[in-house]
């Protein structure tokens, strides 16, 4: 009987988990140039493999960077990280402190976490904004899961089925990631990101000279578990480009480039290192860095040069000497310890007290005192006031001690004493 109740308790505990696995809510947005955003169960809970399966179920694919840029130009923006082809991004038009760290453009996140939302691209959607309700998941197959599509206008459409083809995604459907907005203090980023802009045509890939790209890095932080991959692109001779903690040197002889590790400056401020990009893009350098895929790859497969903590703006700042672009690290301001501040405050207080004591002592020492000689009996305080008033003129004398130098010689003193003695004798005889 005890076993029965034990199993029943376990069953009740696992029931909410099984129900959660049998229900999936998919919140989708309007389509902009075919691109739309999908959020699962109100939190970041989609893996990269599940993102591809989910877009496939909507008869769509993961969008490329070109398609995201096109959707951005049509007015598409969100405040949620989502997968695209090769990246995790947020499209932003208006700057917001809690969205993409207040940046605009297609903000590319570099992170070591694995669950986000996803973006999908439907090639058959209109080129402009399309907010018609989605009522079906056409490419889903049979399954026990109740899938509910929640449109932007609030309409809901449900069907039973399944779209996940990877068992690890099905088993990990109970994984809960924090639902956070980008740019907040709890952002799921450990290494920062950079923004993909399209309005400064400064870098041209060698395979297609008609599509300009501009990649501006926004945070120079240490990548942990990031993806470095291959870098390349048209660069001039005698140039140096900083690549995610490496420096690629291109000598004047235009031979193979070399990679030299460099240490990024952790100053807490956003620095800018600008690199010159020449018109001649016949010189191609393709270096291999650790990792499987670079977050700076062009969507068409062409390599673009990304500098972490810098912007490629078409002109150079810094000294180029012997084929190297040197940038100086900003000096750090020393911080005053708290104990030193407390000690200085105590010393100042002690100095103020010492000055006050010295001033008070000087006042006391400078006071004048009078010496009163009373010829009456008893103390002055014990006598009556009438007696004191009547005898004040008679009995009180001011005694002045005057130090006078003797002006007479010893012989004169002796003569004066003898004269006095004779006078005293005469007075006694007379009496």
From Swiss-Prot:
Disulfide bridge partners, by residue number: 30-131, 55-120, 79-99
GO BP field: cell adhesion; inflammatory response; positive regulation of ERK1 and ERK2 cascade; regulation of lamellipodium morphogenesis; wound healing, spreading of cells
Residue spans, topological domain Extracellular: 23-338
Biased composition (Low complexity): 181-191
Organism: Mesocricetus auratus
Entry PTM: N-glycosylated. O-glycosylated; contains chondroitin sulfate glycans which can be more or less sulfated.
Protein name in the entry: CD44 antigen
Binding site for hyaluronan: 43, 80-81, 107
Keywords recorded for this protein, A-Z: Cell adhesion, Cell membrane, Cell projection, Disulfide bond, Glycoprotein, Membrane, Phosphoprotein, Proteoglycan, Receptor, Secreted, Signal, Transmembrane, Transmembrane helix
Amino acid composition bias (Basic and acidic residues), ranges on this chain: 158-169
GO terms assigned for molecular function: cytokine receptor activity; hyaluronic acid binding
Gene name per UniProt: CD44
Spans annotated as Stem: 226-338
Extent of the signal sequence: 1-22
Subunit structure: Interacts with PKN2. Interacts with TIAM1 and TIAM2. Interacts with HA, as well as other glycosaminoglycans, collagen, laminin, and fibronectin via its N-terminal segment. Interacts with UNC119. Interacts with PDPN (via extracellular domain); this interaction is required for PDPN-mediated directional migration and regulation of lamellipodia extension/stabilization during cell spreading and migration. Interacts with RDX, EZR and MSN. Interacts with EGFR. Interacts with CD74; this complex is essential for the MIF-induced signaling cascade that results in B cell survival.
PANTHER family: CD44 ANTIGEN, HYALURONAN RECEPTOR
Polar residues bias spans: 302-329
């Amino acid at each position: 009987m005890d076993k029965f109740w034990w199993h029943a308790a376990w069953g009740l505990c696992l029931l909410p988990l099984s129900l959660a696995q049998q229900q999936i809510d998919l919140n989708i947005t309007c389509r902009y140039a075919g691109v739309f955003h999908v959020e699962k169960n109100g939190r970041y809970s989609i893996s990269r493999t599940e993102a591809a399966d989910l877009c496939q179920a909507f008869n769509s694919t993961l969008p490329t960077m070109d398609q995201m840029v096109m959707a951005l130009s049509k007015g598409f923006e969100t405040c949620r990280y989502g997968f695209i082809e090769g990246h995790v991004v947020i499209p932003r038009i208006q700057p917001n402190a809690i969205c993409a760290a207040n940046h605009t453009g297609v903000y590319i996140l570099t992170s070591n976490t694995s669950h986000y939302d996803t973006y999908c691209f439907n090639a058959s959607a209109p080129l402009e904004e399309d907010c018609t309700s989605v009522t079906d998941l056409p490419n889903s197959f049979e399954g026990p899961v109740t899938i509910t599509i929640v449109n932007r206008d609030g309409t809901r459409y449900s069907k039973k089925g399944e779209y996940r083809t990877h068992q690890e995604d099905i088993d990990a459907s109970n994984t809960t990631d924090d639902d956070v907005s980008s740019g907040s203090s709890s952002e799921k980023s450990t290494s920062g990101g950079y923004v993909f802009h399209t309005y400064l045509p400064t870098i041209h890939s060698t395979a297609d000279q008609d599509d300009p790209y501009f990649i501006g890095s926004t945070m120079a932080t240490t990548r942990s578990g990031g993806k470095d991959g291959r870098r390349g692109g048209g660069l001039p001779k005698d140039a140096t480009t900083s690549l995610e903690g490496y420096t690629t040197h291109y000598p004047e002889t235009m031979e193979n480039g070399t990679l030299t590790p460099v240490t990024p400056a952790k100053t807490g401020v956003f620095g800018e290192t600008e690199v010159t990009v020449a018109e001649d893009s016949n010189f191609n350098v393709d270096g291999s860095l650790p990792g499987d895929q670079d977050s700076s790859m062009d969507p068409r497969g062409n390599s673009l040069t990304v500098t972490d903590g810098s912007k490629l703006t078409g002109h150079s700042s810094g000294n180029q000497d012997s084929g190297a672009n040197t940038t100086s690290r900003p000096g750090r301001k020393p911080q005053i310890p708290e104990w030193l501040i407390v000690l200085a405050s105590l010393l100042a207080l002690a100095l103020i007290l010492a000055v006050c004591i010295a001033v008070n002592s000087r006042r006391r020492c400078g006071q004048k005192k009078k010496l009163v000689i009373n010829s009456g009996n008893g103390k002055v305080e014990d006598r009556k006031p009438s007696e004191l008033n009547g005898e004040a003129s008679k009995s009180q004398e001011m005694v002045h001690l005057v130090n006078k130098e003797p002006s007479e010689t010893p012989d004169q003193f002796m003569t004066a004493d003898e004269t006095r003695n004779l006078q005293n004798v005469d007075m006694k005889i007379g009496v």
